Amino acid sequence: MNTKSAMITICGRPNVGKSTLTNFLVGEKIAIVSNKPQTTRNRICGIVTRDNTQFVFVDTPGYHRARTKLGDYMVNTVRESIADVDLTLLVVEPIASIGPQEEGLIEKIRASHCPAVLVINKIDTVEKDTLLEVIARYSQAYSFEDILPISAKTGDGVEELLRVCGKYAQEGPFLFPDDVTTDQPERQVMAEIIREKLLWCLDKEIPHGTAVEITKFSERDNGIIDIDATIYCEKASHKGIIIGKQGAMLKKISSMARVDCEKFMGTQVFLTTWVKVKENWRDSDFLVKNFGYRD
C-alpha cells in the first residue's frame, strides 16, 4: 500500500478555535485551550493517520502584535510555520469584517506561495446570511483553494475538511509512527496542562505572566509517575495570588492539572508544585529560551 503524508499549518488570530480544531481532528486533547488569548505559545503537531494517509497538523500561536520577547517568539513561530508546508488553513470567525491580523496572515500566505484553505469556524453561532457575507468578503481578499464552514466545537464540517486536506498529501513514507498523535515530549505536555489550569483559574494579566518548568519526571516500578513542577510568575504579588489563602488556589490548580495529567499518561500521577518569581521574564531572551520557547 502506497502511503502519503501532508504537513498542514493551522493559523489565525487568538481565540478563533485553532487548538479546539486540532484536538477534534486528532481525537484527543494534545493542545491546551482556554477562553483567554495567547493560550498557545509553541508550535504543536497533532498527527492523524487514516488508512494510507498521515496528516500532520501544526497548531500555531494566535497571530498578534508582539509586545514582549515572548510575543516576538510566538509571532515568528507563526511566520515560519506558514513556509514550506503542503497546505495552510487560515481559521477565522464568522465576522464580515477582515481584521488586521487576518490581513497580515493573508499577506504571509501570499508570500509563501503555499496552497491555502479558508476555514470559517464557529458556524453554530451565526445565521446563514452572515456566513454568506463572510465568504464573499474573504473571496475578494484572496484566492483560497477552498472555503469551508465548520464548527470545531460540534464537529460539523470537520470530516469534509479532512477530505479536502487529503488532496494535498504527497506520496512517501509516514513522517511519524502510525500510533503517535503528537510530537510533544511528555514533560512538555505536563507543563502545558498545568499552564492551562493557571489560565482557567487566574484573572487578568497574571496567567499570561506565568511559565511552567518540569523539574522532575520519573516513573516508579509500580507505574506511578512523580512530577515536580515550578510555576514562575513576574511579581511577588502574583505569587501570593497563585498560592492563595492557606495555599487554596495552588491546591486547586494542582488538583485540576493532576486529573488531566493522569488522563494523558494513563496512570496515577503524584504532582508537586512550587511557585517562584522571575521578574519580567517575558522580556528576557535568556529566560524565554530557558522556559522552552525557542526556535
Sequence positions of predicted segments:
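Canonical P-loop GTPase G-domain recognition
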Residues: P115, D124-T182, E186
